[in-house]
Amino acid sequence: MSKLWGGRFTEEAEAWVEEFGASISFDQQLVNQDINGSIAHVTMLAKQGIVTKEEAEKIKIGLQYLLEEAKQNKLHFSVEAEDIHLNIEKMLIEKIGEVGGKLHTGRSRNDQVATDMHLYLKEKVERIIKATKQLQTVLVHQAENNIETIMPGYTHLQRAQPISFAHHILAYFWMLERDVNRYEDSLKRINISPLGAGALAGTTFPIDREYSAELLGLNGIYENSLDAVSDRDFILEFLSNSSILMMHLSRFCEELILWSSQEFQFIEMSDQYATGSSIMPQKKNPDMAELIRGKTGRVYGNLFSLLTVMKGLPLAYNKDLQEDKEGMFDTVKTVEGCLHIMAGMLETMTVNKEKMGQAVTKDFSNATEIADYLASKGLPFRQAHEIVGKLVLHCTQKGIYLVDVPLETYKEMSLLFEEDLYEVLSPYAAVKRRNSAGGTGFEQIKKALEKAKGLVGEFVGS
């Protein structure tokens, strides 16, 4: 077939060259955005008198027809037409005649594809924000049910201090809240229009870029035509934000995997989110959590891939930028899928409160409570730390725990120890007493839950 840009060429490319250069196999995902962008463009052309109202109406009718066909997956794309833009233009001309060729007046594929991706990410980021809020809602519900569920808090994966399970869950709530904030802030840079920037230098036609942007629901335009067609920082920002979100999900999944093991038994995954072994009949594997952890790497890869593509490109457009889409599409699909799976997995898991409680009954996670006890009686904390360290050493040598040490032994270490010491050794009491702002104390958790509910708003109770 003849190319829409083929006027200056005398030889046709080999079929394998066409296939190598074509992007229609993946950029057809932009079909709705491409057609909607074209409708806005031709509407602006008519307003400015660049095409007649009759021509614009005929073009819009043709585009609306193609849009409906696209929604029903009835469009047939060809490699020969290279990309989504030329495929749609070719179909339009076939549908309404040569007047369809006027659609591209005052526009280049360079600003057209950038516009498509802005519109695509606008829709997808808003969906990801909603999915993240739904996951946060599940965390709120789990936290409400586990305010007084006591578990070990860890540093270096060693038991450190007793905490509320709700406190642990809410840590991820606030991480996700920052993820939401990052996505919301990125919409300021996504919701601007490159349309009308042309190939790189603008156009001689008296277009109205602000009007086109308004029709597309965007909040403004790029102020520099070179910038508009040659940068992909809005995609990089999306990939970066998504990498941080996936890192948070991956860390949580790592803990879920550990907690569901026989060594911990803190939680049990629902059968819906676990699989078995083809050889070992007893196995219940946390495959969905492992997949989320694994898929985090591919999102990182998409970010670094595009950063590497962009780092050496001179202004303005270069064909290298065709590599900006597949990683973006893959990241959207991966993030949306992981958020959905994560929400279901957390909503249906069973919390083994007894096992969590047992894990802090016979250990040394209450050692800091004793140091704080001495410090509250006026002893410098460093001296208190030294005394408690010796007590822990004494216990490990005797095969006992701090709760088993008689008061006489405590008094040998410091006369500040009294009978009330044993009250602070209780894990429940230790958690309850940590009532500083943002701490694991029950009253602080209740305050945090109220704030969290206010942030997820309409999703609470769903």
Swiss-Prot record:
Domain of life: Bacteria
EC code: 4.3.2.1
SS bond list: none
Record pathway: Amino-acid biosynthesis; L-arginine biosynthesis; L-arginine from L-ornithine and carbamoyl phosphate: step 3/3
Location of the protein in the cell: Cytoplasm
Catalytic activity: 2-(N(omega)-L-arginino)succinate = fumarate + L-arginine
GO cellular component: cytosol
Keywords: Amino-acid biosynthesis, Arginine biosynthesis, Cytoplasm, Lyase
Pfam families, per database record: ASL_C2, Lyase_1
Biological process per Gene Ontology, one example term: arginine biosynthetic process via ornithine
Enzymatic class: lyase
PROSITE patterns named in the record: FUMARATE_LYASES
Keyword rRNA processing part of the UniProt annotation: no
GO molecular function, one term: argininosuccinate lyase activity
Entry similarity comment: Belongs to the lyase 1 family. Argininosuccinate lyase subfamily.
Protein name as it appears in the record: Argininosuccinate lyase
Species of the source: Bacillus thuringiensis (strain Al Hakam)
Lineage: Bacteria, Bacillati, Bacillota, Bacilli, Bacillales
